[in-house]
Amino acid sequence: MMQVLSIQNCATTKENPLSGKLIILTGPSGVGKGTLMRSLLQRHPELYYSVSATTRPPRPGEVNGESYYFVSRSKFEELIAQGEFLESAEFAGNYYGTPREAVLNQVQSGKLVVLEIELAGARQIRTSFPEALSIFILPPSFEELENRIRGRGQDSEEAIARRLQRAKEEIQAADEFDIQIVNDDFEAALQAIEVALFG
């Protein structure tokens, strides 16, 4: 049975020792991270979900401050320069980042904090917080992943090709993470995440 570890000593400790828990949820674009995350939060309101900042435009139905903090590229670069992110990365031509202060405050207060982030950011967090629990979500097959990405109907053929190439590369990194979960059956994948978090 996997235990979620408390973060005691961070590799980059200018911060105080942390008493809460940090969970990283990552995987390639289109694998269902966001849908799994939303269901997890509905079933477990005690979890703290870290809302990321991004420079990409909102998708239909996304709400600023709930889905993401939508900011301009110049504002994002200013926040990077000020050290306001725990991690930041560029993906598909847009920046994404995890706000530092809110996450550290929640972890220090003893909360279970879940970060749903891209691979590059997940690697940064694992370096800074080696005791964080990391979960990599995999598609049942690459063909299914392609169907999901195309099914969104939001990207050009060129953007889809870029996402698919990046997804191939990211899937190769799955073994870097503590737990790998295949999102074939949604409910089973959700339950596997719950077991990892709560035992």
Curated annotation (Swiss-Prot):
Record keyword Manganese present: no
Q: Name one GO molecular function term.
A: ATP binding
InterPro entries to which the protein is assigned, alphabetical: GK/Ca_channel_bsu, Guanylate_kin-like_dom, Guanylate_kinase, Guanylate_kinase_CS, P-loop_NTPase
What Gene3D superfamilies does UniProt report for this protein, alphabetically?
Guanylate Kinase phosphate binding domain, P-loop containing nucleotide triphosphate hydrolases
Q: Which reaction does it catalyse?
A: GMP + ATP = GDP + ADP
Q: Where is the Guanylate kinase-like domain?
A: 20-198
Principal location class: cytoplasm
Per UniProt, the keywords (alphabetical) are: ATP-binding, Cytoplasm, Kinase, Nucleotide-binding, Transferase
What role does it play? Essential for recycling GMP and indirectly, cGMP.
Could you identify this protein by its name? Answer: Guanylate kinase
Where in the cell?
A: Cytoplasm
Q: What is its EC number?
A: 2.7.4.8
Q: Which HAMAP family match?
A: Guanylate_kinase
Gene Ontology cellular component list: cytosol
